[in-house]
Regions:
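Histidine-anchored nucleotide/phosphate-binding helix
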Residues: 17-31
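Metallocofactor- and cofactor-centric catalytic cores in central/energy metabolism, strongly enriched
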Residues: 15, 46-47
Length: 190
């Protein structure tokens, strides 16, 4: 949950390409042996919710979600959970509590969500931006992805430029891009 008022990266991905998130969640579910995924989304994102629901129905119609996907032993489904947009729900234990209908407050670890998370089950928590990268990395390869960024921090990062900056909007830059480059070269300065 991106409760920060100026952040809209995850919403943009869910509005623009919800299928990438569904694909990534199914891949992750297969990799870890899970049969259910949850998408925690702010109720204040009606367009993202609408498009995600449509994409989920399409995935089910094409046999990409549900029981015995492509006539295999693998079954996987995705459920939408609605959040209230509290900034603290970006922390994984707070997010899990909110999905369970509790107050979205973080708790101390251990136990870590991977051991005992949503409803006491082992839970893997990832954000939309991370998930959106999975299908393209699988298609293009790790070496391709590592060609962006630095030796120690490969890949790209999405930022929302908002507030007192000349060029507002979403940008995706290689890891290692300086704040000066983001603000002055891409954002046009303040």
């Amino acid at each position: 949950d991106e409760g920060d008022p100026g952040a809209f990266m995850d919403r943009s991905i869910l509005e623009g390409d919800p299928h990438s998130i569904i694909e990534a969640m199914a891949i992750c579910g297969y990799a870890i042996g899970a049969n259910k995924g949850l998408v925690y989304i702010r109720a204040e994102y009606p367009l993202a919710i609408k498009r995600l629901k449509i994409a989920l129905e399409e995935a089910k119609q094409y046999g990409l979600l549900g029981d015995n996907i492509y006539n295999t032993d693998f079954s996987f489904d995705i459920e939408i959970k609605y959040g209230a947009g509290a900034f603290v729900c970006g922390e994984e234990t707070a997010l899990i509590h909110s999905m369970e209908g509790q107050r979205g407050e973080p708790t101390t670890k251990p136990p870590f969500p991977a051991e005992s998370g949503y409803r006491g089950y082992p839970t893997n928590v990832n954000n939309v931006e991370t998930l959106a990268n999975i299908p393209i990395i699988i298609n293009e390869g790790a070496e391709w992805y590592k060609s962006f960024g630095t030796e120690k921090s490969s890949g790209t990062k999405v930022f929302a430029l908002a507030g007192k900056i000349n060029n507002v909007g979403l940008i995706e830059v290689p890891m290692g891009t300086t704040l000066r480059e983001v603000i002055y070269e891409i954002g046009g300065g303040i």
